[in-house]
Design a protein with these regions (language model features):
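Bacterial N-terminal signal peptides
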Residues: 21-32
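Outer membrane pore-forming secretion/assembly proteins and partners of Gram-negative envelopes
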Residues: 40-169
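Amphipathic, positively biased hydrophobic alpha-helical segments used for protein targeting
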Residues: 32-33, 158
Length: 169
């Protein structure tokens, strides 16, 4: 069997170019780019520290020494309602972009989601907090400067509070 030959002497698939080869090449390129973009999105991470704190009003002020990074904030309103603060739990956790991470608490539970990194020095996070009965008591998206602390508050009976403080690097 002989191949048909074009005027230039090429086989027909070479004579007019190969449209299906271009389609295959484009598919390969698009797939590679999509994979690269997926990897780039997955690489957006940050390391966060979570402090679970109990707060109450008492006769003598007392702040757990482990809370020294947030001590100044705890002495200002609205936290100055209480004067006794005790660390309940401490957790370091990496967060990946758009992935909700569970934050185990002594009282209830929480989740943290890294929304995005802003200006290379700030992180935008969504935090949800549930009480011990599973009722959501906080759901907030906020931007925090690296090294600064956010504090979420859940008021409890008897003028007590349940606080979740966090910072990210």
């Amino acid at each position: 069997m002989s191949e048909r030959v074009s005027e230039r002497g090429d086989a027909p698939w070479r004579a007019k170019g190969c449209p299906w080869a271009a389609v295959v090449m484009m598919t390969v390129i698009v797939s590679a780019l999509a994979g690269t973009l997926k990897e780039a999105r997955a690489d957006v991470t940050t390391e966060c520290e979570f402090l679970e704190i109990s707060a109450k009003a008492g006769d003598k002020p007392a702040i757990d020494p482990a809370l020294s990074p947030v001590e100044k904030k705890l002495k200002k309103p609205p936290f100055s309602t209480w004067n006794q603060f005790k660390l309940l739990s401490h957790l370091q956790k990496p967060l990946a972009k758009k992935k909700a991470e569970p934050i185990p608490l002594k009282i209830g539970s929480a989740t943290a989601t890294l929304v995005e990194i802003v200006d290379k020095s700030k992180v935008r996070l969504t935090i949800t907090m549930d009480d011990h009965k599973g009722k959501q008591v906080a759901n907030n998206t906020a931007t925090v400067e690296a090294g600064d602390y956010l504090i979420y508050v859940h008021g409890l009976p008897n003028n007590e509070g349940h606080l979740l403080s966090l910072t990210c690097k």
